[in-house]
Amino acid sequence: MNIAKIVREAREQSRLTTLDFATGIFDEFIQLHGDRSFRDDGAVVGGIGWLGDQAVTVVGIQKGKSLQDNLKRNFGQPHPEGYRKALRLMKQAEKFGRPVVTFINTAGAYPGVGAEERGQGEAIARNLMEMSDLKVPIIAIIIGEGGSGGALALAVADRVWMLENSIYAILSPEGFASILWKDGTRAMEAAELMKITSHELLEMDVVDKVISEIGLSSKELIKSVKKELQTELARLSQKPLEELLEERYQRFRKY
């Protein structure tokens, strides 16, 4: 598949969402709401569910599947209260010894005036800091777009995976082209240079696994992700805490 098709597929409105994966993979998934400071951000969803006999905290960025839903979800662009909600749930997971699984699909954090006034940069930075030392296993999965710091704020993890037709980048191809050439129409040319596809990033050791989507129905893809999670969480849970944290630290220091 060429780069233009991959970018279109990553942004496709019909792609599986965080809630599709959360309810399809985890039994008895219960959503939790709010950051306990300002409000509940519809762009970030999270809660607790069971993976076999293991309780897991699930957090992710939610895009809508219709215009009405996208307005509710702010088109998957979190406000600072969304990142603070995510951090609240991750710290709760740490307190009770639950592993964390994050699902990421965002063009980036919301850049509006209100978001900046409420500390968007601080909220993202704090998530990076806290996740780097969170004392439970973390797996992050990019399921569509992984855009800039808005995606990275949920991706400081022991394992970072990508669905095959997802992308992960410092900014959008359109933004890159506008900055580099002052011409947003050269976005796909920029995408080729940026190396944003799953297989390119796996080759560069930015991500640890690419989960195939080819020929799989939605149910089959969810089942595949569930199987991978069960295997990897069991493996990570066996690691001594000091080793887990040191490997996570070294994973990101090497960049």
UniProtKB/Swiss-Prot annotation:
Domain (CoA carboxyltransferase C-terminal): residue spans on this chain: 1-235
Enzyme Commission number(s) of this protein: 2.1.3.15
Coiled coil location: none
SUPFAM superfamilies assigned to the protein according to its UniProt record, in alphabetical order: ClpP/crotonase
UniProt keywords, alphabetically: ATP-binding, Cytoplasm, Fatty acid biosynthesis, Fatty acid metabolism, Lipid biosynthesis, Lipid metabolism, Nucleotide-binding, Transferase
Record entry for activity regulation: Inhibited by pyrrolidine dione antibiotic moiramide B (CPD1).
Pathway the protein contributes to: Lipid metabolism; malonyl-CoA biosynthesis; malonyl-CoA from acetyl-CoA: step 1/1
Function: Component of the acetyl coenzyme A carboxylase (ACC) complex. First, biotin carboxylase catalyzes the carboxylation of biotin on its carrier protein (BCCP) and then the CO(2) group is transferred by the carboxyltransferase to acetyl-CoA to form malonyl-CoA.
Recorded family membership: Belongs to the AccA family.
The name this protein goes by in its record: Acetyl-coenzyme A carboxylase carboxyl transferase subunit alpha
Gene: accA
